[in-house]
Amino acid sequence: WRDGSDYKEVLGYKPEKAWIATDGKTIIPNHYDLIRSNNLSISSCGKKMYSVDEMYKRVFECTVDKNGYLINPNVIIEEGDYCVRNIKDNILVGDDDIKIYKNGKIVKSIHVASRPSTFDIGGTNKDTLFITARDGIYVAKIDLEENDE
């Protein structure tokens, strides 16, 4: 178990081995530290990917290169625990509450009765936030469009 001070290096780790999933398309890297992850994000080559360093409570933004590796990790938010999502250019970060950031600034905070563990967006109009917490599941309606500047 590491102390987390090498999180930036771990994000850019390039494994020598990988497996092909049963769909014949998905690559699963043989990553020595994947077992520590509790929340994986989906991204595409050339796009941004976000990861939370839970030990030091900070969010990293990386770019996915043409080979699927994470490059240029930078801290963009100095808080976070467990889960981060980029939805309509809003960065949602779970910690004591779920905070919504736009252009590096908090625009909204969603409080639930118990500390959130994970969350994701859903619903027909992608306006429903589903939150798992230590004592239950919560649902919140959100309007991310109203946060546009």
Model-derived regions: residue spans:
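Short loop/turn segments immediately following the C-termini of beta-strands
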Residues: 1-5, 54, 64, 95-96, ...
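Predominantly five- to eight-bladed beta-propeller fold
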Residues: 9-10, 14-17, 146-149
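Beta-strand initiation motifs
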Residues: 21-28, 66-74, 105-108, 146-149
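Glycine- and Gly-Pro-enriched alpha-helical subdomains that act as flexible
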Residues: 41-62, 66-73
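Blade-level signature of beta-propeller repeat domains, shared across WD40, Kelch, NHL, RCC1
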Residues: 118-149
